[in-house]
């Protein structure tokens, strides 16, 4: 069975910045683990925002920010399968906002995960795991029939 991990930004940031769950994220994203790694195109913006906030707050230097963003840039299209944010995905996210009262970017992340779920339905021996550090988003993913995991459960 091949695991396909869909990582939202709250999970993926742990690959680039040490925090609770970083070791687990490193293990599932390691090349040797042979997992498929999928992210939403919107993660590009969200990760830049999260890391820039750390620099503004003084927990990361400008030099560290540059190094981490360069690593992410290098991995963005080589390490991850990118789910494009197109009109159909935006419409799906809009429906999720209304249905679950989600924030806009959370809805785009969930819509991206649901899109991956539909793609994998026809692929035998694959398992989708939606990974987020947001418990509410994970509860909603579960209600949509997606297996999930939270990196914060692996301190």
Task: List PLM regions with ranges.
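Amphipathic alpha-helical segments within well-ordered protein domains
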Residues: 48, 52, 94-97
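Helix-adjacent hinge/juxtasegments
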Residues: 53-88
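Short, well-structured N-terminal submotif of metal-dependent ribonuclease cores
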Residues: 1-43, 54-67, 146-155
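Alpha-helical elements of the RecA-like P-loop NTPase motor core of helicases
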Residues: 23, 49, 91, 138-139
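Aromatic- and histidine-enriched alpha-helix N-cap/loop-to-helix transition segments
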Residues: 39-45, 105-108
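Short glycine/serine- and small hydrophobic-enriched flexible loop segments
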Residues: 49-56, 114-118
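Acidic, PIN/NYN-like endoribonuclease modules and their adjacent C-terminal/linker elements
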Residues: 2-4, 116-155
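Active-site neighborhoods of divalent-metal-dependent phosphate/nucleic-acid chemistry enzymes
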Residues: 78-136
